[in-house]
């Protein structure tokens, strides 16, 4: 498990550009699109080299079934971009991501913003999520 110092719990908000979609295997205008609302992200670096990262967006104090979006991936050498390998839109429902990236912004080692997008499919259905998250600076 990651050292406790490698987990950051960041309060903030998802911007209006955050949403999830659900539809057929090919993205289409008829896909069901839902605004994604969050006020918190938990960023966990799973290894000492800070290469394996998990970002989980959701509502602080949210119920088990409240909307969430999780992205699990590997940081690129630039230290700011992650290639997403797995994603989930419900707890314990990890799925391989067809494609996905997260771009992180840091102040020192603290995450101040994150933009993630990824999609996954199961059978003939496709889910996608795009999250644009900005931290609230400490006053």
Report residues per predicted region:
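Acidic, glycine-rich flexible loop segments
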Residues: 77-131
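N-terminal hydrophobic targeting segments
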Residues: 1-2, 116
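Short, flexible coil/linker segments at or flanking structured domains
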Residues: 2, 7, 26, 31, ...
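An ectodomain-focused feature that recognizes extracytoplasmic/extracellular
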Residues: 3-81
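Short, solvent-exposed mixed-charge patches
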Residues: 138-139
């Amino acid at each position: 498990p990651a050292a406790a110092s490698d987990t950051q719990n960041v309060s903030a908000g998802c911007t209006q550009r955050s949403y999830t979609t659900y539809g057929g295997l090919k993205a289409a205008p008829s896909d069901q699109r839902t605004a994604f609302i969050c006020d918190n992200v938990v960023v966990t670096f799973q290894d000492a080299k800070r290469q394996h990262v998990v970002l989980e967006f959701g509502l602080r104090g949210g119920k088990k079934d409240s909307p969430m979006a999780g992205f699990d991936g590997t940081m690129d050498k630039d230290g700011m971009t992650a290639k997403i390998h797995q994603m989930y839109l419900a707890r314990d429902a990890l799925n391989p991501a067809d494609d996905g990236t997260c771009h992180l912004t840091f102040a020192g080692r603290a995450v101040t913003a994150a933009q993630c997008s990824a999609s996954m499919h199961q059978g003939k259905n496709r889910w996608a999520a795009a999250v644009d998250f900005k931290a609230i600076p400490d006053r």
